[in-house]
């Protein structure tokens, strides 16, 4: 598992300098695996478990005094041609100088990948996270030294660092979809995807160089055939670029997005070997084997099938689940991830490919945004009426029921739908007050990617919005022994930028979710797979798991940290999580996330796996 840790301090401060040297020695003494990637005046970067061409350090060597740095992660050269395969970067002295003299802008303009850059120019220090932020960057501090890191167990091992839970952030995550840009630990923050932090003796400034809104207005592709050809070329070239360092991989195949991904991976030249892995449930809504088998047979790819069995509630210890910056599943996911790791080892594979981000980037949503965007950019023209009919069919609603909102939003002020709350009767009234105060504080600062600028349309804001919340992140909730690298081509910069340049009504070609992607890859997949309309509803597995372990969950939660902090109502838990009581679906759906938050909170407060076992809940 590749990871890094960086220290930034004011080199003119003797006490901070002494502390920085103490921290460096602490980590190198803990393990000889920690190596120095960069050591400058007030900036030091350590890393470990480097694999050249996969995850490594790229030196920013300028040969100038007090100027230089390093990029950690995976960096590829940019080529604006959609069919061009990118190569692993090698940064020359002139290129390093350009990166540093542009305060990192050149890194975003000339390269792409999964990386964090640390560099300096005189007393100014910079931390730059790639636009997708899949290699996380967290920050804490100690005695005048800023500490940046990617894997929390590394800093948690330092007993002199104290961490405490930020309960309002936890509360918000129980009601709204989790925003991984906020860390529920008081002493930690997360550097956002695409954010550049400039640290000077006078203070800190945060900037975003990558501008997705501007991309939506640049070289727009409205012709369906051209868009289809460009999307296909980009996905094929990107997948080939990402697969290049590996000889074998598993594609986590299930839905249409991962089937298209498998079709692209099947084009990667030998000696690359591909295997499919499909996890299915007994419930028909969670079983996609009919389509998966067709795809694998058509492409000649061997398939591993894994049945998701409902198991007894078991809390896995630190040997399976490390301490994480956010609540994570301690029950089901660790065993499944170990299963994937073991299968990858068996076949001699080295990496997992995952279709995450396909729903959002290839665009599958049956909303009105495609019609609204067309109306705002083209006005009332003949294609508008076809688009209205397609939107009606996708939403399974009448034209007359969607037309008023289309007219209102098409001619009115730009806006997007607010994220809906998901409260349950198990939460206390205090939680809502806590969450509202937290939301009001957050709403004072709108993320620059979501501000209506650059003549951007509401649909393109909806297209961009999932990228800001950090939902797509490296598998940090894994111990190094079971770690496997996961690559997500749909969340790579070349694919994202291509999709952003294509209007939504073109992405929804033929009035179908991912319609353009279907058209682009229809010759590589069986027709039944290309034109399938069903999608797995895997949530029923967790309902079954919750029902099977209801007594243990009730016992765990009733006297737990979430009750003690006033987030969950003990009386409601006792009444609702009872097999003799009819449980509402909304209450049922939240229980598993409450259990994850409870176990995480106990671990954060110092409880060990053995403590939880002794409490008779595991």
Model-found features: residue ranges?
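PAPS-dependent sulfotransferase catalytic core
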Residues: 527-584
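Structural motif
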Residues: 106, 163-168, 450-462, 512, ...
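ATP-dependent adenylate-handling active sites, centered on carboxylate activation for C-N bond formation
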Residues: 1, 5-17, 123-137, 141-143, ...
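Cysteine-centered catalytic environments shared across enzyme families
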Residues: 1-311, 318, 325-326, 595
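Acidic, carboxylate-rich catalytic segments that either coordinate divalent cations
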Residues: 559-618
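Short, hydrophobic/amphipathic alpha-helical patches that form generic packing surfaces
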Residues: 168-179, 462-473, 477, 589-606
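Short, motif-level signal for alpha-helix interfacial/capping segments enriched in acidic residues
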Residues: 111, 233-234, 334, 468-473, ...
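Short amphipathic alpha-helical segments and their helix-coil junctions
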Residues: 95-98, 157, 445-454, 500, ...
